[in-house]
Amino acid sequence: MTSGKKVLYIIEEITYFTLLIFAITTYCGATSYWNHDQSKIVMVASCSAIVGILCVPLVEHILKINFSIFVDICIAVDLILSIILGEASNVYYRVQNYDKFLHFLGTLQFAVLGYSLSKFFLRETNKGSHQLFFSLMFGFFFAVAIEAMWEVYEFSFDSLCGTNMQKYIPDEFISCVDEKGNYTCSDEEIAAFYATKEGHHFAIMDTMYDIICDTCGSLTGIIICGLIFKFKPSLQDEIIRSEERRVGKE
């Protein structure tokens, strides 16, 4: 691991550990950075970031590869956009379609990463034909699968922690939900909302739009890979390298 990566990891871990402390103190009532429900989301997101950052060198060790600093920078930027800006600064709720933009951007990056992984291992084994087509398909489905797991992640914490990551609770009813997740507003208000087309589709709309954005982002990612890496194959070596090549270069 290069010194640049070590510094980046340390800064990220300190940042999200600090954010976690702020979220815990807010949840306990000692500070008031967010409301009670938002502090839970920030806690979950901060813990996920802390674990996720540590998983990057673990994946490198298991697969015996080295991601370029470009990959780590992309991860750092994504975490800033989603956690620090999106959740901690409430940009998700202030900027329309901000969540959809991040889904599109995330799957685009995962498609490029999946493509690069496939090309790397195919190049290492030097087996098989039509490697470009296979790698493009792998990149597409790799990105969609990662984002599908993200939806499972959101659903799991919504169910276990009472958060609203999947936006299944309408904004106008957020203040009417108790600690057990039950509505405290009148039955007439609830019935009036869910009797409409918007109401009985509401619970799945956010997730389905996320999946659509994921698919579009992944498709865009493999198109970019096909256009750029087809004519500049040397760029593939800038994303993933084997441990042996890195050591030899050093």
Tell where the protein language model's regions lie, with residue ranges.
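Cytoplasmic-side transmembrane-helix entry/capping segments in multi-pass membrane proteins
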Residues: N66-V77, K100-H103
